[in-house]
Amino acid sequence: MLSRVRSMGLNGIRGYEVSVECYITNGLPGFEIVGLPDAAVKEARERVRAAVKNCGFRFPVSRITLNLAPAGTKKSGTLYDLPILLGILAASELVRLPKTECAFLGELSLEGKLRPVRGV
């Protein structure tokens, strides 16, 4: 299954649109984030995995590929935790995303609570 979640990135004090694309397929279980993520974005894998389980959902035992587009722009910080979580849940057909144009960003605690992010 495939899902897309709108988010925002920060370049100094300027924001730019980021599309979080999530593709879940059969195969060897794995969780990869591509699209020039920094260490904090790569660490989202563990925060999101814990948050999904602690919010009462089942984390998919599948191959998960997340693309942060535009792929040529470096992504940094923890603000992608929430859109990554929503992308996985939407691609797993566990939640429906709103049809309206909105962007999601926020850091997640391991228990699934939202935390503020710098610059927003």
Residue ranges, per PLM feature:
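Peripheral, non-AAA+ core regions of ATP-driven protein-machinery
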Residues: M1-V120
